[in-house]
């Protein structure tokens, strides 16, 4: 394929053939790099139908020719300087797109990249380069026993070091934070927005006090009150690691507001991520309760600073979330270049329980940052 000559890949987005396929147009630039644009959906041509696929070039897109992480399948352990010395954090690149590079910030604090793995079913077909990343203390990254490192500003500095190591800049760098990750993304944008091309704030209010009020005034009154009383009693007695506490939360809170699927149907990456949460980070920062925040983040509020974030920003909320969707809509209105995406069937993990809305809205936002043509 010569420079500028396009070819088209049509990828099925639903194995049953009920959703239109997406058309991704690829061309080779003069410098040899691949560039793609993702058009709107084209008519469905039947189940499992892939047309005009150039397998060799598709493989190049995934392998990232000339990238230093090809041998490791996209994995890089990034050295991070901290006040207590150097540690390493785990990252994994998927895809190769010079214009759209998305770094994913997981929640918790202390959760893992794993619950983002559902993105693999959607972002590659849209030609988006994205990075999994376990923050320090999480999953595959170093896990120092150092409570003094679990500070917001220290995490912001870590993200900046990761950005530099991965070679991301304002021509391509999108940052997506979900839950605690959105807190971190807001803080990063307030300090380093000159490096951002765009920002995605997923399922997180800009004020922990407002979140606590929503939990107390809206979520808790709708719960079974006997179950709520037992949950509170277990929290007050410090028994949040008791299996009974988790069972009560699952039945009366999680399947309503965290992931609206029966527990036995929760996707394996979500179950795995929940099992790997580092409570040595989570409890000091978030607090032991799942019905509000009482840790180091309890007073965090950046609502009054949102107007300072000038990069294009997508705010994602959900009808059944633990986070007030009206508050998230207001966040988008406060951001100079904000837009709001509402997931009417979704909860805190709307990327799973309202996947079609979430992924199509995210991809549309990222596609807006591409060149229209070579």
Region spans (language model):
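N-terminal cap/lid segment of alpha/beta-hydrolase-fold proteins
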Residues: 64-88
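Conserved HGGG/HGGXW glycine-rich cap/lid loop of the alpha/beta-hydrolase fold
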Residues: 84-143
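Active-site loop/oxyanion-hole signature of alpha/beta-hydrolase fold enzymes
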Residues: 135-180
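Conserved hydrolase catalytic core segment
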Residues: 171-214
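A catalytic-pocket lid/entrance helix-loop region that shapes and gates access to the active site
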Residues: 198, 202-240
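Alpha/beta-hydrolase
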Residues: 222, 226-307, 311, 330
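Conserved loop-alpha-helix segment in the C-terminal half of the alpha/beta-hydrolase fold
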Residues: 303-345
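Catalytic active-site module of serine/aspartate enzymes centered on a nucleophile-bearing elbow/loop
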Residues: 337-374
